[in-house]
Amino acid sequence: MRKTKIICTIGPASESVEKLRELMLAGMNVARFNFSHGTHEEQKEKFKRVDRVRKELNLPVATLLDTKGPEIRLRDFEGGRAELMAGQTFILTTDEIMGTSERASISYKNLKDDISAGTTILIDDGLIEMTVEEINGNDIICRVVNGGTVSNHKGVNVPGAVLSMPYISENDRKDILFGIKMGFEFLAASFARCKEDILEVRSILDEHGSDMKIIAKIENMQGIQNLEEILSVSDGVMVARGDMGVEIPLEEVPVMQKKMIKMAVAQGKHVITATQMLESMIKNPRPTRAEATDIANAIYDGTTAIMLSGESAAGLYPVEAVRTMARIAESAERDIDYRSRMSRLSGEVKSDITTAIAYATCTTAMDLGAAAIITVTMSGFTAESISRYKPGCPIIGCTVHPRSSKQMNLLWGVQPLVIKEEDTTEALFEDAVEECKRAGYVKSGDIVVITAGVPLGITGKTNMIRVVEVE
């Protein structure tokens, strides 16, 4: 069973019921909805299709709402686009105008106050570069360094600048409330800069009684510098290499990726490696060798999940991309020395009961050659505690709550399983083993290690280990 989870962005190439079914059967664990594109009505219809198919297939596929975040974009151009030449003057303005090859409007009104002469401005993921020469009223007068085609709503990056724009825009707030209403399991907070940004998102969720898990997207230098504090208040991070590769020098992206994975693993948090993992498969049925190696290296480093963006949203081969990603992941996972990895993680064991029990569960399972670790959990916390130590055997996350099973589907190595409610803890444990057997995860004669928090239902308390032989 594959341990690393796969996230697929849903778009025109994958939003039909037929394609969603194929993606889920190919191995998609989480469906990502990019709220930079599409109306609420369009997103609602996509969500309903995902929900319909996951119920039909009885698979705990989770949904992730990816916010726009505090981004800066160009506004519209006459004819939809314009050509910029190296060396020419180009003006960015906060005035409401239709763009031309000489000037264009930007979405962030106060950009002129956050930058100065000499600042570098990048457009369209860095394909177009310009330098600020002067600021005159509402106009930012720039010299084009690298020219090219600019078009409607292309992204604008200002590497290294500390922007004063609020973190949650009115549109983002509406999107978050929409996500709460629809029942998304995860929320990706784009361009997270500091822990206060995540706490602001958390307060909206708490205010509306939502248990959505928050994934902080690290995409700029502020986020990188504040990574530790962001991790401490979020449920995980996404290594968003697209905008990160524009905001920081390209050669530093691999270094930052490794640091982010290492820090997230140490804190027992989700870490999603994203962007261009199988970029060539947007047009080709086979990936490059470099892409295969990129995926494998992220898995060797300990990433929780790997993500497809354009490959699954708009590519010619979305299902093949998922199958390819799954095969590469399984191959890398077969090569990992889990005992050695656990010994490295042992330094992260804390003195509290939960982490001590979680680590002991993993070492017991490894020493006994257990077929599986079975966690009986209401919220998914116990499974999360076990997952952080990345044992070699499968972790079966048994819960009576379908929503918890979907949230567990992003946990490394965890196979979620919904079981029926029982009157006693003992009956629940027996039912968990029986359901694991029925699902084919274990068989008669297997040794399994059961762990849970007793009494059940108190989140954040894992305090029991039991070793049993499956009857």
Stretches with model-predicted labels:
Residues 1-471:
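Non-catalytic helical/linker scaffolds that mediate oligomerization, partner binding
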